[in-house]
Amino acid sequence: MGRGKIVIRRIDNSTSRQVTFSKRRNGIFKKAKELAILCDAEVGLMIFSSTGRLYEYSSTSMKSVIDRYGKSKDEQQAVANPNSELKFWQREAASLRQQLHNLQENHRQLMGEDLSGLNVKELQSLENQLEISLRSVRTKKDHVLIDEIHELNRKGSLVHQENMELYKKISLIRQENAELYKKIYETEGPSEVNRDSPTPYNFAVIEKTNVPVQLGLSTLPQHSDAEQSTAPKLGLQLNP
């Protein structure tokens, strides 16, 4: 058998009434949520129980829904009555002018102007605002400086790594040159290396048996005064 038709009237039993209220409340909240999601609607729902307890649901925020409702209702009334519409926009313009005046006055006071009409309490409030603003500015400045320092440290680390890599490459090149020179020295002999090497001084060894060894500068054959004055040759001279 199907369910019988429920008569819509107040439930006298308090327990049954509370159970029905809880079930119906959850159901209507579920429907409101589905409506907001499926139809992209802004939904606001408020329910007061018989005991005065508030239950509410809003797809955005209840305050924005109520504000939108009040504004929409005023606009509808203004459209219905041209005189009311004119008064509405006049009030809006006056309110905006007042807000602009307040902002300009507050700005001048923050800049230290137009302070003659303020009492001690108002001056203290203005001082507190300035201190809060100054702390915010200093905090932001500190954060910016810290970020810049971190960035400079990062760049410094990169430069240091690049220098280390360059130093390793230079050391490797020097090692390769030393090995290459050693191979040439072993292949061609000391005489070939000394003859080909562009050293500014030449070492000569003169040997005689049973003769004391003395070190000195040996003079190469004299060709001309110009040649003799340029590039003296370093030699090992054995004198009798």
From Swiss-Prot:
It comes from the Eukaryota. InterPro entries: MADS-box/MEF2_TF (IPR050142), MEF2-like_N (IPR033896), TF_Kbox (IPR002487), TF_MADSbox (IPR002100), TF_MADSbox_sf (IPR036879). The keyword NAD does not apply. Residues 86-176 form the K-box domain. SUPFAM superfamilies: SRF-like. Residues 1-61 form the MADS-box domain. It is found in: Nucleus. Ubiquitous. Residues 220-231 have a biased composition (Polar residues). Coiled coil: none annotated. Residues 220-240 are annotated as: Disordered. The keyword Repeat does not apply. It holds the Pfam family K-box. One of its GO terms (biological process) is positive regulation of transcription by RNA polymerase II. Keywords: DNA-binding, Nucleus, Transcription, Transcription regulation. SMART domains: MADS. GO terms for molecular function: DNA-binding transcription factor activity, RNA polymerase II-specific; protein dimerization activity; RNA polymerase II cis-regulatory region sequence-specific DNA binding. One of its GO terms (cellular component) is nucleus. Probable transcription factor. This is MADS-box transcription factor 27. The lineage of its organism: Eukaryota, Viridiplantae, Streptophyta, Embryophyta, Tracheophyta. The gene is MADS27.
